[in-house]
């Protein structure tokens, strides 16, 4: 976990890197990313929130050349797509498959849910409830109780891990891609897999 303020944990499975500024944080993150270059990134709604936010901040603070460090091939591009009634900016990090668990869940589970918020899906699939935001906004939470704010974000990651442990949707995606001789993300479409 990378952050700007003090955070304390006794957990052996959580490492916290306290940074002096956003610039310092993103530099440390890029070094970590390159050292542990992922093949796949996942999370809940990462395609429309986490990845665009991260890419836009890196571009704004450092420029396009630093953004390219996310790709083992040095190629990152953005495009606008229309989904859920509005335009969204999304990024493709070449050489790193973005498998948004939100999309995997919608594609490979055949029961409509009343909500696709992670909290609801965690309750339906795992019997778990996420910690609620005790403040008016996430900004308030971040500013007034940084410790529990970071714990909440760790909980999000753990829920996606538990969903994968139970449902094996990434494993399914990889198996289908291997069998179909296509890229991992092609499995999320409707045509490419069958070509």
Model features per residue range: what roles?
Residues 9-16, 20, 37, 51, ...:
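Active-site-proximal helix-loop-helix substrate-binding element of RNase H-like nuclease domains
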Residues 28, 53, 121, 159-163:
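Amphipathic alpha-helical segments that form well-ordered structural scaffolds
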Residues 29-53:
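Proline-aspartate-enriched helix->loop->beta-strand connector
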Residues 1-26, 32-34:
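Alpha-helical interaction scaffolds
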Residues 2, 42, 97-100:
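Hydrophobic/aromatic beta-strand patches that form the interior of the parallel beta-sheet core
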Residues 139-195:
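Common nucleic-acid-contacting/processivity interface regions adjacent to the catalytic cores
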Residues 26, 30, 154-157:
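Short, hydrophobic/amphipathic alpha-helical packing segments
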Residues 52-65, 178, 191-194:
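Short secondary-structure boundary/capping segments
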